[in-house]
Amino acid sequence: RTVAESVGRVPKGKKAKVLPYRIHDNPDPQKLETLREFTAKFGYKVKTAGTKGAIARNLNKLMDDCEGKREQKLIQSVALRAMMKAKYSIHNIGHFGLAFDYYTHFTSPIRRYPDTMVHRLLTRYQQGGRSANAKHYEDLCEHCSDMEQVAQNAERESIKYKMVEFMGDKIGEIYDAHISGITSYGIYAEIDENHCEGMVPMRDLDDDYYDFDEKNFVLRGRRHHHKYQLGDAIRIQVAKANLEKRQLDFTLAE
């Protein structure tokens, strides 16, 4: 990280030359407040006001404090929703998550194309070359950011596929699970034993009419006031495993 930070730093008195940076904008203040309120339910006190560096340190401390605890994945999920997405650009704004003013992807075990761009430009500049064409490299940065998202989506879909494939012969089996997501159309549940995730559709929650509280990640019943919220322990039964759609359907077990 130190090398990656130093490579992108502009010496005093020097005009910055074109270079691809790894940038990460400040998080959405409203979403940070939602994160603060959510984590308070688990006993965490997170300060979401102050300087950019202070907020980053507070969030990193939160990740350390919840590590290994049952609510870790839930808190990480809510925290990620508050974060902006990191991307590549020649227009440096710093990297919030790392609390760096300058950061670039300089090296990795598996070579990324942005690393190669940086290597080529450094060689060019060390040999006295002029600053590269800004529009050309910004277009390349945008393309790399887009392809990174494509790769991440492919990774997620492949994981879903293997989950459904694994659970295909377990229809009807009952597992301990916890609620890993709440939406207006149902409950996501993650099986404690194997971490496979599926959905209990809203249509199967037929004991009441449930309203979705998006801010607090809760479903509340209108008549009986029963509620489902992130982290709740539940028992599920595997209902369907649709490999084509990469989708697991659960029902609540009695």
Per-region residue spans from a language model:
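Append "with occasional cross-activation on large, charged helical scaffolds in nucleic-acid assemblies
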Residues: 1-192, 199-201, 206, 210-217, ...
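OB-fold/S1-family single-stranded nucleic acid-binding modules
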Residues: 226-254
